């Protein structure tokens, strides 16, 4: 099933690149005219508002359920909780798993974001600026982590990092999976940074980089003074996405983190869920905090 998903995803991506990736309009000058707002009056305005409110409420239902469950004392057989309390939030933050898990998640997500920014910029540069054969294949391979289920990748990392295997050094002496989790998070979120960097390179004018090189600037100085300032907004957006999704990564966290002192925040939420009595309320409260 995974092989079928990979083949279909790669084929669809390459087809979309072939059909839609030929345009070079990103470097064209921006139009000077300003777009005008169109005010919808009467029933059109009310209908548009109703559609947006309906979509917003539908998308907010899971979040609303978590918030209500985190503050409920007794909720059975009714639409809303009969009583609300803030004790679950205090108890969740006071649990011995919570603060270390937040620190671990910040460490793992920050490391993954740095890896994604470095690799993402390098891969995007090869895809957009180089003339190496196989650039389209590299572009497709980078997007594959979005098509592979997280549990499949997690079990693959777990198998490769077992004692006696080639990548067993990624697990510390005391079983610390920090390096393994950083790599797993980085691979899962690398497509976001690559796509952001590719978009930035396509929109920036290559003539600026060529002018700097022709005037004697070394490649690293050109990158620092010309390319990176032009790509800063794109890299910032990609880095934020990579960090945010890595903070709340579920599949890799549940499989690769097995000791309580190494739990990221998502594994801590799962552990609180299994607490006897008010486990669901505590897990929901920590989910709201997260």
Regions found by a protein language model. Name each.
Residues 5-7, 12-13, 50-63, 144, ...:
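Transmembrane alpha-helices
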Residues 36-39, 130, 204, 210-231, ...:
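Short helix-to-coil transition segments within interhelical loops
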Residues 51-54, 97-109, 147, 156-193, ...:
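Loop-to-helix entry region at the N-terminal start of transmembrane alpha-helices
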Residues 15-54, 133:
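Transmembrane alpha-helical segments of polytopic membrane transport and secretion proteins
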Residues 30-40, 73, 77-86, 91-94, ...:
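Membrane-interfacial helix termini and adjacent extracytoplasmic/periplasmic loops
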Residues 12-27, 111-142, 206-208, 219-226:
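Transmembrane-helix boundary motif in ABC transporter permease subunits
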Residues 41-52, 122-157:
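Cytoplasmic-entry segments and transmembrane alpha-helices of multi-pass inner-membrane transporters
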